[in-house]
Amino acid sequence: GNNRGLAAASGDYLVMLNNDTVVTRGWLLTLLRHFQADPQLGLLGPATNHIGNESMVPVAYKSIEEMPAAARQYTLAHMGELYPMQTLAFFCVMMPRTVYELVGPMDETFGRGFFEDDDYCRRIEQQGFHMACADDVLVHHHLSASFDKVDGGERQMLFERNKSYYESKWGAWMPHRHRPQRRN
């Protein structure tokens, strides 16, 4: 999957984007501008409505039809803002080709999912780069649309196996968390 796409991609920046996402106007150019402003930025993802880490933000829409207007309002209120993160979920990420060439392909030992994104983030950190969530980009995510088709027992077995493999490489895994909510 991802490794084949990354190897075939051309251009100075690479994007991994799941098929269970809906992007908004200007998302790609806005991500690109952050890289142009910060040469130490190694990986960047958008804010989103639904994910198991700090990229999730409160959204003001109830339907996909309302999403573009609500996303525009949110992103305009957060223009230029980056939220530093140690681990991004790969439902939507961008990286410079130079970073990909230093870090290399994703570790295929992880197989179908769980921890491959955590592992890749550790490898990016090893090369001296940092990661962030671009709060001025919002991408809608229908969380785990394809993974929900996997049997619960099989999913748990894959999680435990990959967690063990990740920890053999990097030490104890720190569970993802959501960011603290802002008080107005």
Summary of predicted features, one role per range:
Residues 11, 38-41, 129:
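Short, high-confidence coil segments that cap the C-terminus of an alpha-helix
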Residues 7, 50-51, 55, 63-98, ...:
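A recurrent flexible, glycine/aromatic-enriched loop bordering the glycosyltransferase active site
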Residues 21-60:
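Conserved donor NDP-sugar-binding/catalytic core segment of glycosyltransferases
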Residues 14:
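Short aromatic/hydrophobic "clamp" motif used to bind/position activated sugar donors
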Residues 26-32, 80, 84-104, 109-138:
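A short, conserved alpha-helix in the catalytic core of glycosyltransferases
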Residues 1-9:
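Glycine-rich, basic loop-to-helix element that forms the pyrophosphate-binding segment
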Residues 52, 58-59, 118-184:
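Active-site-adjacent helix/loop segment of glycosyltransferases
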Residues 17-19:
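Catalytic metal- and UDP-sugar-binding loop of GT-A-like glycosyltransferases, i.e.
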